[in-house]
From Swiss-Prot:
It comes from Brucella suis (strain ATCC 23445 / NCTC 10510). Belongs to the UPF0309 family. It comes from the Bacteria. Pfam families: SIS_2 (PF13580). Residues 30-214 form the SIS domain. Gene3D superfamilies: Glucose-6-phosphate isomerase like protein, domain 1. This is UPF0309 protein BSUIS_B0903. GO terms for molecular function: carbohydrate derivative binding. SUPFAM superfamilies: SIS domain. GO terms for biological process: carbohydrate derivative metabolic process.
Amino acid sequence: MTEITDRYFNDVIARLSGLRDRLAAQMEKAADLIAAAARADRRVYVFGTGHSHMMAEELHYRAGGLAITVPILCGSIMLQDGAVASSHFERIEGAVRPILDRYGIRDGDVLVVVSNSGVNAAPIEAARYAREKGAAIIAPTSVAYSNTIARGRTQLLSLADVVLDNDAPSGDAVLEIAGSALKVGPVSTALGVTILNAVFADVAARLVGEGDAPIYLSANMPGSGDINRSLVERYRDRNPHL
């Protein structure tokens, strides 16, 4: 392993170790909200723009994941149809409401709004939309980054029921390169995925204990076909991506 790859591993491991203790109470609160939604046959929606949309894909139809999870996916806020355009789109006031209207978010649901910076128009509008519909809001975000760049703008962290601070630094990248002012090695995705999978694992453990755990199996595991088909039929009415 080279010196810089070693530094990257060490940085991510150190941040995850710190998050395990510092975020324990907040992760438990997030699990409380999601478990309550599951018991009430509600849904957990996951929204993010740019690279943050990967959290929605990570939790959707996932081996070991909850079938109540619904990703909010639209090419205009993702990267594959034009990264520059999507970066512009997420800053336009009112642009995401028509996207959210497709999903039928309602009272008792949970919306996970993922935004590392936590200040762009799209995640702010998504959180306000959820509040309007009576849904709870969980916000994985970087508090340090958001506080640095807010400059009087509304911050996602001020709108959420639960804030999951991912400890990513301003600008996301953590590694300095000798002889350059540039930084490389973004960490928000690695940290965010770990936080959310830990929360969802907590929820799953609670539901297993209560006798109703809608959890997908890997498609390559014996018996997965029948189990996954049953879950898809049960939950596809409110998940357009199944």
